[in-house]
C-alpha cells in the first residue's frame, strides 16, 4: 500500500483533493533552510527538522606543533625576575710563548663578562558568560575549557612570533628578541662592547661581521648554508645541528632540486606509479649534518598597504612628514648596489598596543635610487592621542613595484622614538637613512646548535591560568607567561639575511 492507493471519503479515489502530484511532493520536502529560518513562519514541515551539526570542531587556526622555534628552544626555570650569567670572553691574550732557558713565561689573564637579562610579562585574558557555560554545545564541548585552550594557543603563537623580532629599545615592555640580542652580542664579541655606540656603528659592526651572511635577495642555496656552517665551527668555535627559517625559504630552496629528479622513459616504475617532487629534510655540510626546521611565524614580516588602518584603538596617531625624501649620493655603506630601482615608503607609529595607520612618504611617486645611493627622509610623532608612540616602523616596497592601493609594503627596520633626535643609521636629526641593509620582502635563517649552552627560554613561571574574581555572571581568566629568550653565546649562531625568491 502506498500513498497513491489511499481513497478519500467520497469514494472518488482522488486522494490529492484537488492538488496535483507536484504540489503533494512539495509538501513532503524537508526543505533546505535551517530550523531557525522557519521561526514564526507557516511551513510544510521543514520547521520540524532536527539540526544536523557536526560534533567535531574544525580548527582553522595554527597548531601548537607549528611553533617550532618556541617549542624546541630549551626551557630553564629561574627564581627571580632578573637572571645573571657569566661568559668566558678570552682564555688570555696571545703573548709570546717562546722563552730563553730558565726564563719565566709571559703572564696573561683570562677575561670574563658578567651579564644579566630581565624577565618580561606577557598574557591574554578571556571571558565566558554563565549562560554560555550552561548551554549544550556540539560534541558536548565545555566552552570555558575550550576558551582556555584557545587563549593558551594564542599566547604561545604570539610569543613564538616575537621571539625573533621583539626589541625592548622600541617597546620597553617587550623582551629583546633573538635578532636584537644577536646584534648586540656580535658587537660585543667582535668589538668588545655595544655600549655607547650609535645606531650606525651597531649596524656596521653587525652587518660586516662574519656571523651575518647576506644572500642579496637570492634563494637559499647550499653555498650559503655551507658558509654559515663554516663560520659557526671555524670562526666562532661552535657546533651546528639545524637551520631554522620560515617555510617559504625552504619551499624555494627545494625547488632547485626538482630538475635533479630524473624520469627515465621506458624504465619500469619510472613514470607510471612514480613518486614525483622532492623533499629536503637535512643538509650535509663539510662540518656536519644539519636538520631543516620550519616555523611559519619565524621572521614573518607581514606586508601592509597604504590604506591600512590602525591595528588597535590604543595605537598612536599617524606620524607627520618632516624632511622630504631624498637620496644621498656616493654612500660607501649602501647595499643598493645590485638593487637599484624605484621604491615606495610608508612609516607607522608603534607602541605596545599596536601600530598607527601609515604615513605615505612617497605619495607623490616612487623614489628612484641608484646603485651607489641611499635614501633619507624625516618624520615626527603625530600630535594628540592618549597613547604615544615609542617607536616607528619603516616599510618599503619591492624594487620597481607599481604604487597603488594594493601595493605591498614590507617592514625593513624599527627606530626607537628616543633615537630620532640624533638620526638613524647616519641620518640627520629626526630623519632615518635606508641603506638597504634589509631587502624588502626577504627573510632570515639561523644556523646553530640548539642547546642550553647556546640559547634558552627563561621561565620565571610556566605558562599558567589565573582565574579572576567573579563579579558578574561570567567567568574571567588570564593566560600568563613570564619569561624571556636569552642567547648565551650569540656568535655561535649565524644569521643568513635577505633570503629572497627567484627574480627578487
Report residues per predicted region.
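Disordered, low-complexity "stalk" and linker segments at domain junctions of extracellular
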Residues: 304-443
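Flexible, glycine/threonine- and acidic-rich loop/arm segments that mediate assembly and lattice contacts
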Residues: 1-313, 342, 367-377, 429, ...
Amino acid at each position: 500500500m502506498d500513498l497513491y492507493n489511499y481513497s478519500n471519503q467520497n469514494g472518488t479515489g482522488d486522494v490529492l483533493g484537488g492538488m496535483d502530484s507536484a504540489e503533494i511532493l512539495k509538501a513532503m520536502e524537508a526543505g533546505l533552510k535551517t530550523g531557525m529560518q522557519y521561526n514564526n513562519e507557516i511551513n510544510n514541515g521543514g520547521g520540524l527538522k532536527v539540526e544536523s551539526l557536526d560534533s567535531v570542531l574544525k580548527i582553522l587556526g595554527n597548531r601548537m606543533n607549528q611553533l617550532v622555534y618556541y617549542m624546541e628552544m630549551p626551557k630553564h626555570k629561574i627564581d627571580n625576575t632578573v637572571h645573571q650569567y657569566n661568559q668566558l670572553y678570552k682564555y688570555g691574550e696571545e703573548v709570546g710563548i717562546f722563552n730563553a732557558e730558565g726564563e719565566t713565561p709571559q703572564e696573561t689573564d683570562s677575561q670574563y663578562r658578567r651579564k644579566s637579562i630581565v624577565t618580561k610579562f606577557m598574557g591574554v585574558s578571556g571571558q565566558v558568560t554563565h549562560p554560555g557555560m550552561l548551554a549544550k554545545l556540539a560534541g558536548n564541548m565545555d566552552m570555558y575549557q575550550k576558551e582556555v585552550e584557545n587563549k593558551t594557543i594564542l599566547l604561545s603563537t604570539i610569543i613564538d612570533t616575537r621571539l625573533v623580532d621583539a626589541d625592548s629599545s622600541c617597546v620597553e615592555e617587550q623582551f629583546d628578541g633573538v635578532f636584537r640580542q644577536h646584534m648586540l652580542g656580535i658587537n660585543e664579541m667582535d668589538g668588545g662592547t655595544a655600549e655607547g655606540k650609535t645606531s650606525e656603528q651597531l649596524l656596521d659592526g653587525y652587518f660586516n661581521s662574519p656571523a651575518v651572511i647576506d644572500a642579496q635577495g637570492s634563494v637559499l642555496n647550499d653555498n650559503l648554508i655551507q658558509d654559515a656552517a663554516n663560520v659557526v665551527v671555524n670562526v666562532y668555535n661552535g657546533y651546528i645541528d639545524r637551520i631554522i627559517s620560515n617555510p617559504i625559504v625552504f619551499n624555494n630552496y627545494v625547488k632547485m632540486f626538482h630538475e635533479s629528479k630524473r624520469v627515465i622513459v621506458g624504465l619500469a616504475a619510472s613514470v607510471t606509479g612514480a613518486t614525483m617532487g622532492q623533499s629536503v629534510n637535512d643538509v650535509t655540510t663539510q662540518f656536519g649534518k644539519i636538520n631543516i626546521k620550519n616555523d611559519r611565524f619565524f621572521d614573518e614580516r607581514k606586508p601592509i598597504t597604504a590604506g591600512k588602518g590602525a591595528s588597535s584603538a590604543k595605537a598612536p596617531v599617524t606620524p607627520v612628514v618632516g624632511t622630504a625624501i631624498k637620496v644621498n649620493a656616493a654612500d660607501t655603506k649602501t647595499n643598493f648596489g645590485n638593487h637599484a630601482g624605484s621604491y615606495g615608503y610608508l612609516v607607522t607609529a608603534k607602541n605596545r598596543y599596536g601600530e598607527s595607520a601609515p604615513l605615505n612618504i612617497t605619495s607623490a611617486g616612487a623614489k628612484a635610487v641608484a646603485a651607489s645611493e641611499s635614501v633619507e627622509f624625516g618624520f615626527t610623532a603625530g600630535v594628540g592621542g592618549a597613547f604615544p608612540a615609542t617607536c616607528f616602523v619603516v616599510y618599503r616596497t619591492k624594487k620597481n613595484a607599481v604604487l597603488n592601493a594594493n601595493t605591498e609594503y614590507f617592514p625593513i627596520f624599527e627606530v626607537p622614538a628616543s633615537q630620532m633626535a640624533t638620526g638613524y643609521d647616519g641620518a640627520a636629526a629626526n630623519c632615518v637613512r635606508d641603506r638597504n641593509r634589509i631587502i624588502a620582502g626577504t627573510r632570515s635563517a639561523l644556523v646553530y646548535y640548539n642547546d642550553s649552552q647556546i640559547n634558552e627560554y627563561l621561565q620565571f613561571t610556566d605558562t599558567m591560568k589565573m582565574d579572576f574574581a567573579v563579579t558578574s555572571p561570567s567567568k574571567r581568566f588570564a593566560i600568563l607567561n613570564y619569561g624571556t629568550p636569552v642567547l648565551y653565546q650569540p656568535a655561535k649562531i649565524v644569521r643568513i639575511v635577505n633570503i629572497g625568491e627567484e627574480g627578487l
